[in-house]
Amino acid sequence: MGGEWIETTVGEFCPFEYGKGLPERKRKLGPYPVFGSNGRVGSHVEPLIKSSGIIIGRKGTVGSVHFSKVPFWPIDTAFYVVDASHRDLRFTYYMLQSLGLDQMNADSAVPGLNRTAAHARNIKVPPLSEQQAIACILGSLDDKIELNRQMNRTLEEMA
């Protein structure tokens, strides 16, 4: 590691796209997760996004960041980011989690994340190879945390 990190903005590095409405009454139980601003809210028979991606809370649970390893449907209370050749998606997920987007509430009645303000955030990003190495390390730690959670659930069920 040790390549030059570049200064850019969130909007240039990983532009947020708007999710698309999918009311509960129109959802058909299926294999693809449906995400809102607070995480997974159901499933559907077809995905809007045909790859893995990042989901960012736009309305309600402002700035929450979720990752889908499978194709998914982000509803209109969320933004999403998909992979691109210049960035590692897992690195991007971890980077977005570290930005404090949940502190960027722009609306008073219903909490909301202003895309323009989020896009304007200055960030520094490493070369792709370093992004991949960082994501690998953090992903291993996430896997270990999940394994520990599963072990705790199993032990609690046995007690």
Spans of features found by a protein language model:
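Non-catalytic DNA-recognition/assembly elements of restriction-modification systems
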Residues: 1-36, 124-159
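A short beta-sheet element
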Residues: 36-101, 106-109, 114-118
